[in-house]
Structures are given as structure tokens and as C-alpha cells.
Amino acid sequence: SMLSRRFIIGFLRENLVRKVSRLRFDRVISTVDTHTAGEPTRIVVSGIPRIPGKTLGEKMEYLRNELDFVRSAIMREPRGHNDMFGAIITEPTTPDADLGVIFTDCGGYLTGCGHGSIGVATVAVELGWVKATEPSTIVLLETPSGLVKADVHVQKGRVKEVTIRNVPSFLYKPNVQLSVPSLGDVRLDISFGGNFFALVDASQLGMKIEPANTERLIDVGIKIKNAVNKEVKVNHPLLKYIDRVELVELYGKPTHPEAHSKNIVVFGVGQADRSPCGTGTSARMAELHANGKLKLEEEFVHESIAGTIFRGRLVEETRVGRFKAVVPEITGNAYITGLNQLVLDPDDPLKHGFLLKASSH
């Protein structure tokens, strides 16, 4: 049966290759699919045009304005889904960086992403883009929010886990009181961890962070996100193009025995992070530190709504413009789930993807 199986696979492969070469596709996009603590990252490695730009911020704008169909095709149905997440690999624009990375979701682009950085760094070492050294291989990623240093822990040639050193994070606006339609008054903190987050203690809404409440938490998160962007102006003091609260992090009591806090991060068009969220963990640690609740080098274990964990700690204090800031490190695991050739058929009316959910939020 082994022989016949090999014969069948060989036969299929030969005929498929012959057939495929006769097909005419608009694009063949190669991706490496991964997940970090349950949250996907579909990493685009080839099949898209060169992305010009003197900075990663400019490259992100070019993608948004000229190549947005790539993002929608690979993130949305039928190839992706409402909660899909991705990373587009580009040439870096700073000499030290190994790779440039721009993060994508169903709704648009993100300037920074912890789980995605862990996924990209894992793939860079597992697939030999960066030469593996044991016990530690450094991969330097350039993102639109700055340089992210990934320390990839390698054992017997395999990646065990990744510690990323994120961009300086800071509490931006503490104690914001907001009147949110159909929710009433909500108290929140605005904190930066690579993106701007609204941090919300879910207990004030009488809600627990648990899978059964996912839909309701997403609904509440999007309402808060919309209200915050209507009422509060935010602007990163150094990176002027970061000027919106992109994510809402609702937090509560943990269920994992090692965790200090449990959260759900809501973003995009009502997407929920399955991982504890690296930039969200950074933003939360910055807020805790500013309020005297987390010391430098003290471990902070963060649990996701799916029950997976990231381990975080703050390694130094610094400044960002007029803000006191901290440098966070996040440790987590990513695994490769697939090597994909995604094709865009010129005759397919849905070739650029579709979403059912966009209209409801």
C-alpha cells in the first residue's frame, strides 16, 4: 500500500503540475502559515510586486494605496476568515535589520504586532532565512513602529520559543472617562505598546473574560473603540502616522494557575485575538509600571481568552518624547501550520476576498 500511495501521489503531482502550468492566474502568492498561542499569522514570502518606500511607514502606505487587494485576498474569505492575521515581508530600510515586516488583518494594517513578530522570527530561523545558532539566534525585524529584536531560543536545530524586545511602551492617557452608546460610562486607560490600546477593566461592565462571552466582548470592544476615537485625540510623539486607538483590551481575573491577568483584545472589524497579544501585553505592563504595580524585571504572565499564555517583563526605563516609557520583553511560542500557494484566478469574482461581518460593526 505504501508503494501504491507513493505512485498515486507521484501521478497526481505530475498531472497537477502539468495542468497548473496551463492555467493562467493573476497571481501566485506564497505564504508560510503559523500560529502563536493560537493566533494565526499568514506570512507572505513571494508573489507580490516590490514595495517601494524609504521607511517601513512609507511601504505600509504604498501597500494600503496600491496593493490593498493582496491583503484583502489573503486575509478575507474564502482563503482567510474574519479573524485572520498576516505579515508581509519586505526588504528592510535600515542597515541592521534582517527583514522588514508589515502586519495585516481583515480591516487594514497594523504598525506593530507581538504575536506576528514571534511568528515571523520563528519562520526566519526554521526556514533558514537567518542562520541558526544555538542556544540563541538574534533576528532583527523592522516594523512601521520601530525595530523589534527577536531572541530565538534554538535547541537541537529547532525553535523552542522566542523572546521579543518590543518598542518603548508608555501610559499615554490615564483614567479616561467615556460615555459609550448603550454601555454608559466606561473608565479606561490609553497606553502604547506598538499600537495605541484602550485598556478596560471588564468587571466595571459586569463581564468575565471567558470564551462563552466572546461575541459580547467583541461587540463591547468595538463600541468602546469607536467612542474613544470619536472623543479622544491620540498621537505618538515621534511617529506621527500612529494617531488612532486601534485596539481595545478588556481584562479580568485569570483562570490559568500561573497567570496574573486574562484579556481579550478586540481590533479590526470585530476581530478577537486568540493569543494574549504581545503589543497589548506591552501596553498593559507599561500601565501597571506607571501605577507602581509592576517593577522592572518582574515577571508578568498574561493569559488569552483561549487560555494560552505569554510571559512578559520590563527590562529598562526610557523616554518617548515627554513620556516616561519602558522597554518590554515578551516570550511565546509559534508553530508552522502550512506552506501555501494562494492563487488569484482572473475569472473569479471573489478573487480579492469578501467579508460578511464588516457591515455589522
Residue map of PLM features:
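A glycine-rich beta-to-alpha transition motif near the start of alpha/beta enzyme domains, typified by
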Residues: 12, 16-191, 198-361
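N-terminal chloroplast transit peptides
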Residues: 2-11
